[in-house]
Amino acid sequence: MLRYLLKTLLQMNLFADSLAGDISNSSELLLGFNSSLAALNHTLLPPGDPSLNGSRVGPEDAMPRIVEQPPDLLVSRGEPATLPCRAEGRPRPNIEWYKNGARVATVREDPRAHRLLLPSGALFFPRIVHGRRARPDEGVYTCVARNYLGAAASRNASLEVAVLRDDFRQSPGNVVVAVGEPAVLECVPPRGHPEPSVSWRKDGARLKEEEGRITIRGGKLMMSHTLKSDAGMYVCVASNMAGERESAAAEVMVLERPSFLRRPVNQVVLADAPVTFLCEVKGDPPPRLRWRKEDGELPTGRYEIRSDHSLWIGHVSAEDEGTYTCVAENSVGRAEASGSLSVHVPPQLVTQPQDQMAAPGESVAFQCETKGNPPPAIFWQKEGSQVLLFPSQSLQPTGRFSVSPRGQLNITAVQRGDAGYYVCQAVSVAGSILAKALLEIKGASLDGLPPVILQGPANQTLVLGSSVWLPCRVTGNPQPSVRWKKDGQWLQGDDLQFKTMANGTLYIANVQEMDMGFYSCVAKSSTGEATWSGWLKMREDWGVSPDPPTEPSSPPGAPSQPVVTEITKNSITLTWKPNPQTGAAVTSYVIEAFSPAAGNTWRTVADGVQLETHTVSGLQPNTIYLFLVRAVGAWGLSEPSPVSEPVRTQDSSPSRPVEDPWRGQQGLAEVAVRLQEPIVLGPRTLQVSWTVDGPVQLVQGFRVSWRVAGPEGGSWTMLDLQSPSQQSTVLRGLPPGTQIQIKVQAQGQEGLGAESLSVTRSIPEEAPSGPPQGVAVALGGDGNSSITVSWEPPLPSQQNGVITEYQIWCLGNESRFHLNRSAAGWARSAMLRGLVPGLLYRTLVAAATSAGVGVPSAPVLVQLPSPPDLEPGLEVGAGLAVRLARVLREPAFLAGSGAACGALLLGLCAALYWRRKQRKELSHYTASFAYTPAVSFPHSEGLSGASSRPPMGLGPAPYSWLADSWPHPSRSPSAQEPRGSCCPSNPDPDDRYYNEAGISLYLAQTARGTAAPGEGPVYSTIDPAGEELQTFHGGFPQHPSGDLGPWSQYAPPEWSQGDSGAKGGKVKLLGKPVQMPSLNWPEALPPPPPSCELSCLEGPEEELEGSSEPEEWCPPMPERSHLTEPSSSGGCLVTPSRRETPSPTPSYGQQSTATLTPSPPDPPQPPTDMPHLHQMPRRVPLGPSSPLSVSQPMLGIREARPAGLGAGPAASPHLSPSPAPSTASSAPGRTWQGNGEMTPPLQGPRARFRKKPKALPYRRENSPGDLPPPPLPPPEEEASWALELRAAGSMSSLERERSGERKAVQAVPLAAQRVLHPDEEAWLPYSRPSFLSRGQGTSTCSTAGSNSSRGSSSSRGSRGPGRSRSRSQSRSQSQRPGQKRREEPR
């Protein structure tokens, strides 16, 4: 409290002194205050406080001293700031801060204060507070450090807050400037402290200064000369410590004055030609363009300003000359560009020279006045001469020719040699024009004709090292001289390899490859010259020389003198005759012409002429011509015909200028056509291409000529093309398999140009299009079975190539008599052997090339004569035997025969197997017979409409075996029957003793004709010998039932039916019915065991398929047995048929049963089912059975059960002492393994039975059987009664067949059979009937019935007392795998 009071007083004192202003220095004020308050401190402070106890000053204490002075600060609003201050002293001084002389409150003194005093003495501002009205943090701050010795004050430090306003005092504005002009953007930043700096941004990027072009001064942006790239959005940026401010964006638009990308240029054009002035400009904004003509207007109706701003003027004339200007304007400027137009007018004749006739020694003058722009130059020239006559030219040495400045030609002292055409030519840059006039000398003759070459060089193909003679015989007046050129170059006379003879022939010795080329013979005289050319080529096929022609080896004779038949102003028609006396045949003609006005040489005006008349076209009007004709043959050209009489063409209009007819020909002669390699496009088609060099403006078309190359040199076929730009064509229809020689000439208005070098190309071969000629057949000398066929090749035009072979066919009336043979291409005959005498054959021959066989010839019929000692049929038969022997030796026949034999054997084996199987099944059926009581089952499902019996093989039969067997209807009552067995002895282990499928199918077959269930017979018999049993049609379910376990012998028919029943065909019984002995009931079956014992032996029932309930029951015994009167034989009772006929009727049992002795009627008791008895296999006694007693009720049950069948304690007293059977079950088609599974047999015909037959009179989906179980099979060893029958010779045929089948089956491998022990099943012999007691007949089921017959699961009644226990026991017992059944003899 005292300290707070002192501090308060100190602050009040300081504040009062500052207001009074007496003391200027705060440090002095504080010292005075300290000294004045020393006594007060001494009295008020505690005596132990050394800081204010002046009487206890230590020697090391010191007054405060400011070590670190606070600096001036410039901070931003809202930002933190720190004023440092550090002091030294002893004791450590306290730091205080004053603002503008007032004490600064910190958080230590006032929690509401926003300033902090740091331990180092610095004053910290977490956030500078600054507003327009309140500025609490801005001011002058002083740091004071004090201890008891005194106080020290720091320098005054100012704290200022930086400020920058938002509004620019002047924002930049938009600027529009042209390219190259300066631009200025002004900007005045907003107010702020400190004063903000200014920078610029262009399109969001900082703008940098460019030396000399872009500068920033005082906030202004200045560009000395703008560029197109300077256009954009500019922003002025003002910045200081308080931040940055951006102005509104200002756009700088840099426009572009019009500038020319393409300027119009000066042009010079011909009159009537179009002209185009180009003008392309650029600018921003796009400039507008317009055209104007200096000192005039644009030609109305003849100009057009197109979309690209170019100026087009059509059909210009001299008046259109001038300067044309393109003007481009936009908002920032204007530009102009000009081009001049000069129109040249070709020279034109003002005065036309006229033809004149003068006598020798006279003077003549030819006028030739012209005009044009620019003015043309005029000169004269005589045709055929190289001398040019110009105006003002000095006179010739003769002094007879001169040209005036106006273009007039003067000739003085005309001579005979001055005759001819004189040409006036006017030439300027705009073109040229010529006019000619004819000077005729009176009395002139035709002695001055140019030389004529009688025989010139021909085209030749040579081999290296040979010698060649190139002839050149000439004639003329005066006699011409002969010189030779090779490839356009003169041959030197000193060359030793080339030698020119006196008659002009050129001799070349030891020809080399360098000597090949184009040779020309030139005959020259004072009257003119003539040229003849030919080429030499090297032969490629050295060893093959072409066959010489068969014609005379000399050229054709000279034709007759041509005669003029028709004259026009442009054409002359000539006619001549050939010379048939000498030389080779004429293939064509060549026509040459000479005109004194056209030059001093003969020119070819037509070639390849086929007829003896021709019209020469393309001639000049009013011109004299002379003609001669040559014939062309295989050996070259003939000598020329006599020269025709001079003929003048008709005159044309005199006002029309005459043009030079031969000047164009001279220009065409300079046009070089180079033929390229032809391309084969397809059959008979070539593409020909060429290039042209020289004055192409004279070319108006081309002539393409081709022919078949060869020594004969066929005629040329010509194709004229009228387009000068076309330099390729397609030749079609060329003969295949030949060499085609091709050449090309340029065509002009004046005629044809020089020929190109010919090119040869091969055409692909084709099959001959024609048959061989002259096919003939002659009998051969090689016996009577051969002929000789001869022929000639097809026509040359139909061969289509080189014949490589001939195909000969000799066709008989059947294909087996056909013969064919091939012969070489050079052959003309062939012999065919092996013909059958007496047969008519057709013989054909066809030629073949590499492309295929051609058209065959017409058939030629031939028939060989038969020998006189044999008839025609025998001869043919002998031929057939030979051919049959050949066929039998063919591998294909042998293979086919083997395959057929194999298939036949397989079919035979299958038939035998099927037959044997049928015998087995029928024998089973024959051996079985049934007496079954007609009992209706209320719960039966899926049964036939003719029966209400349960499905066979499923449930135990509710009745005991009947006492005696049913005698066969055909048996005598007095016949002696052995007792103890009803089946044949020695049964096969694989055999079944009942026919499930047969009886079921028979029931299905006869079900339609039977009565209702209630009307059926009580007992039925099965007659194996009856006719009805011989036709069993199978009606099997399409899907077999599931696995029935080891009791598949009671399975539905489809599981046991063999191949014999697959198709539902008839089954033929081969055996005879067996007479069965009668047995007594007590001898055959023991009494049943008690129900308590049977309940312990129940087996699994769930495996039985087709049942709707999981349990079985035994139906009650009938109240009375339907017995018939006993037969006279004793012991056998005959059941009367409903219709009183002995024929068999539908039976509902599959195995033999005896008649049941009637018992007194008792109320029906609930039956006790014994399913385990169904699973007990039967035992077979080793010897003949003795009569059985009732004390053995469990006689069919195995003594040693498998793992799946547990024997209860009550079952052992009733087991039979006979040996146990083997493990394998006797069910056909399946084998019972010891683990309780069924394995399919090796041969399985089931898959074939799944297809439903067409006729299904009877079908059960879920009924495994309708009949009682089969009888027990006999033992392996024959019973005593069977031995007695065998000894008595009474064995039936069926027994004998079965005995044979058993022997055959023994050879079958064990894997395909059911391996059975001879003692596998127990055979229960029938004995005389005995009667059961009432309790035995009503309370229990029959033992044999339990073992061999099971009631339908769908017709079960009430359940016995021990059913659930027995079913669970059967499940547990059947699930013990791996335990095999073993049978050990007891």
UniProtKB/Swiss-Prot annotation:
Record gene name: ROBO3
UniProt name for this protein: Roundabout homolog 3
Function, as annotated: Receptor involved in axon guidance during development. Acts as a multifunctional regulator of pathfinding that simultaneously mediates NELL2 repulsion, inhibits SLIT repulsion, and facilitates Netrin-1/NTN1 attraction. In spinal cord development plays a role in guiding commissural axons probably by preventing premature sensitivity to Slit proteins thus inhibiting Slit signaling through ROBO1/ROBO2. Binding OF NELL2 to the receptor ROBO3 promotes oligomerization of ROBO3, resulting in the repulsion of commissural axons in the midline.
InterPro entries: FN3_dom, FN3_sf, Ig-like_dom, Ig-like_dom_sf, Ig-like_fold, Ig_I-set, Ig_sub, Ig_sub2
UniProt KW Lipid biosynthesis keyword: no
Gene Ontology CC entries for this record: axon; membrane; plasma membrane
The Ig-like C2-type domain, residue ranges: 64-160, 166-253, 258-342, 347-440, 450-531
Residues carrying covalently attached carbohydrate according to the record: 25, 34, 41, 53, 156, 410, 459, 503, 784, 813, 820
Subcellular localization: Membrane
Annotated PROSITE patterns: FN3, IG_LIKE
Compositional bias per record (Low complexity), positions renumbered to this chain: 1067-1083, 1178-1191, 1202-1229, 1345-1361
Signal sequence residues: 1-20
Cytoplasmic topology ranges: 913-1386
Ranges of biased composition (kind: Basic and acidic residues): 1294-1304
Organism: Homo sapiens (Human)
GO molecular function terms listed in the Swiss-Prot or TrEMBL record: cell-cell adhesion mediator activity
Chain spans, region Disordered: 541-563, 639-662, 965-989, 1028-1310, 1327-1386
Principal location listed in the UniProt entry: membrane
